[in-house]
Each structure stands twice: as C-alpha cells, then as structure tokens.
A protein has these predicted regions:
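Active-site-proximal cap/loop segments of hydrolase catalytic domains
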Residues: 38-343, 347-350, 362
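C-terminal, loop-rich substrate-recognition/catalytic regions characterized by aromatic stacking residues
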Residues: 2-29, 309, 316-439
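Catalytic-loop region of hydrolases
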Residues: 2-87, 93, 387-400, 404-408
Length: 439
C-alpha cells in the first residue's frame, strides 16, 4: 500500500475465494460474445443486443498492485466512441443482483422476474440495459477482493487513488471515447465521493445513489457506539472474499474509538468534487441519508441534482423504471455530450411518506434543500414521555428503557392537531450529566 498513517492499521483475515460463491469462477482471462436474444438463465432479462465481455482484465495501479475487472461493451463499435461506466466494490464482480436479492430480501423486493439479466454486479447498473445504449460497464474487484492483489482497504485515500488510476487507464483504451462516469448505490456510491474528490481528468460525471459520507460518524461509530454489525455479520461473513486480508474497522474501533488520522481518511472532502453529480437519498436508509445531504450541500459544481425518493435503495436502482431512464439521460448528457435538455430536470425533488397511506408523495419539486420555506419548531422532552412545543417548567422525572433489550424503547409522543408535512433535517440537542463518573 502506498498510503501510510501515523497509527498502526490493524488487519483481519478474509475467507479465500471459493468456486461458485458469489458467482466466482476463478481467474480465467478470456473474451466472449453474448448474443442478442439469449439469456444467462431462465427467467432473466433477454439480451437486446450482442455484448462483448472481457473477463478478468488486469489493471496495474501506481504501486504495482494488480486489480481485475470484467468489461461489458458493444461489439464492433467504432474506435474512441464508447463512454465507460465504472462500478467499484469488493463484493465480487460476478455477484449479481438476482442472487443478492435472494440472499437478503423477501419477495425479490417487488422487482419483476425478467427485469435483471444476471450480468449486473451487486448494487450496479445492468450491462444488458446499458450496452444497448452504447455504454461500456466496467465491474472491478477492488484492492484485495477475490483475485485482486493487495490488502483490502475500504474507502479512503488508497481506494481513491486506485479509482483514479483505473479511470485514466480506461480513458486511454482504444474503444473508449475518453469519458468515464461512475454509477451504483451504497458502497459503489460512497467510493465515488472519494475518487471524484481527487479530480481524475477523465471522470466527467458521477451518480452516487445512496452514499454515506463519513464512515466513522455515520456508520461505524455513530453516536460513539460501534455500529459494524451489518458489516461484520453480513458483508464480511457472506460477501467479502480475498487472499491478503483487510483493514479491520472493528479492531481499529477497539484500539482507537475516537477519531484519528485513519478514521478521518474515511471522510471524503466533497468540496473538491467539481463535476456533474446526480445524488439520491431516501428515508428508508439511515446509513446513507446524511451523505446524500452533505453531498448536495458541498459538491462544488453548478451541475448537481438531488432526488429524495421513497423507495428501498436497490428497488430504486433496478425496479424504478423512471429513475433508470433518468440515469441514462444524465450520462447521455455528460459522457456523450447529447443535448437532451437534461438541465431542465428539477434540481431538488423530495418525497413525503404518508402515515396510514399505501402510496407516498414522490418527486415534489423544491427550490433548494433544506427547503427555504421551512418553519423550524422546537419540541421539548417532558418527564411524562411527551414532546411539547412549549418549554416545560423545570421538574424531575424519568423515562427509562432496557439498553440490553433491542425491542425496548424510550418514547416521547407528540399528537398533531392538523395535517403537517415534515421535510428536512431534524436534530436533537441533549444535555447530559453522569453523577457517578468523571465524564
């Protein structure tokens, strides 16, 4: 690794890649053409065009480390004509959306059979859709993932430099038109903040759909409590595979629970991002919401959009046809230079969840975010478990819960007397004192 810190970075082992796990086929560099009208398996999306697939393409980083990618692109396209969409993550470039939905969600998230081809990487766009529109999809196994060399470093400067090197390598390939974008959600969105902040010359646009903006404060140490259960018990256990181990968030928190140089390296400087950016966020995911908001507030480009939607993130990526069409139009504008009136897309759209109603209110066009017309109200916690708009007189009382029982809660209730919309960034100011300890 080329990136060094003033603190020792603890590592942990990963399970080695296993044939068949997460679609892993072993390291088998080869080219093949998938034919129009074919399917990768029964019930999957029918390919609408021929697709050239380059498997296990090596990409050498600035420190000599070699990463591997699968490239899906149009057959017989003229030289220098195809823009590239980079999809970056450690989950396995052949671990597809169909298998991931079966592993982690009920009822396929409501995404109809035949929507996905099985070529799509987990949390990434489907090559079956994008190649037919004249794009190449590049699915990379990041540093340390599967057969890619090195120690896995999740986010931070090391991964950002790897992304930079990959983008500039892609832009020089004979089929590429020199324009590279990044797409995907969750992990694939988070890494975009880091890579784009380094300003690779050939990175022309990004679409971070649901991307956390600070791994320490928004994920692993939120509220000062270790929050890595999802990462430790699902992602590491079932999804990550590699041969050289990975940086350990859990061990780092045990050794350094307060922010240090390494933790701060997991927070991208979004103010250095200066390219067109299409951001999404949602109420359904508490991990990524603040990253989407901070991205909207801090990205230093006049060409930025925020769509706050009411769906689960993977449904929005794969099942929301309107959203997919918008994403194609966004990249048509900034990777192909097509004058398609994308700029008339509303800069800010919000959604409102309606209690007791099946359908949310979506795509509410707003001037800005936070909403300029917001009426900010203070609500006070009371000793009898209420939220009061009037500051209560000082009194003593208690509301308690069992912190060892995940089902137990301390609740404070406010009853609305008129129809009200809550859109924005609520915050709590809490005054604390511990009489038994010197804290």
């Amino acid at each position: 690794m080329t990136v060094k810190f003033n603190v020792e970075v603890p590592c942990e082992d990963l399970k080695a890649p296993e044939l068949g796990h997460g679609g892993y086929e072993g390291l088998r560099p080869r080219n093949e053409t998938l034919l129009k009208g074919s399917v990768t398996a029964p019930g999957r999306r029918v390919l609408s065009c021929d697709i050239l697939v380059e498997h296990d393409v090596p990409i050498t980083m600035r420190d000599g480390c070699k990463l591997y990618a699968d490239i899906y692109r149009p057959t017989n396209a003229p030289e220098r004509s195809v823009p590239a969409i980079l999809c970056w993550s450690p989950f396995g470039k052949k671990f597809n959306g169909i298998d991931s939905l079966k592993l982690m969600t009920p009822w396929n998230l409501g995404i109809p059979e035949g929507t996905l081809s099985g070529l799509e990487k987990f949390e990434a766009p489907d090559p079956a859709e994008w190649v037919d529109r004249g794009y190449a999809i590049i699915n990379v196994d990041s540093r340390g993932a599967f057969d890619s060399e090195g120690v896995m470093a999740i986010m931070g400067t090391q991964e950002a430099e790897d992304g930079y090197d990959t983008i500039e390598w892609l832009a020089k390939l004979p089929w590429c038109n020199g324009s590279v974008g990044m797409a995907g959600n969750s992990h694939l969105a988070i890494i975009m903040w880091f890579v784009a902040a380094l300003q690779p010359p050939s990175l022309k646009a990004i679409a971070p759909w649901e991307g956390c903006g600070d791994l320490y404060r928004e994920q692993f140490a939120r509220g000062g409590i270790y929050g890595g259960d999802l990462f430790d018990h699902l992602i590491i256990k079932y999804m990550l595979r590699g041969r050289n181990g990975m940086e350990s968030f859990k061990k780092m928190f045990q050794q350094h629970p307060l922010a240090n140089e390494w933790w701060n390296d997991k927070r991208p400087d979004m103010k250095k991002i200066n390219i067109p950016t299409y951001i999404t966020g949602t109420y359904t995911n508490t991990m990524h919401g603040m990253g989407a908001i901070r991205g909207w507030l801090e990205v230093n480009s006049p060409d930025k959009w925020l769509r706050w939607h009411p769906y689960q993130e993977w449904y929005d990526l794969w099942g929301n046809q309107e959203g997919r069409a918008e994403l194609l139009n966004f990249f048509d504008r900034y990777l192909k230079g097509i004058e398609n009136d994308w700029e008339s897309t509303p800069r800010v759209r919000m959604s409102v969840l309606r209690y007791g109603e099946k359908e949310p209110i979506a795509n509410v066009v707003e001037e800005d975010f936070p909403l300029p017309r917001t009426n900010y109200r203070k609500a006070y916690l009371t000793a009898d478990g209420a939220l009061s708009l009037d500051q209560p007189a000082p009194t003593s009382g208690s509301v308690s819960y069992n912190s060892e029982d995940s089902r137990d809660l301390a609740t404070f209730t406010y009853k609305f007397t008129e129809r009200t919309q809550i859109v924005g960034m609520p915050k709590a100011v809490l005054y604390m004192r511990n009489d038994d300890f010197d804290d």
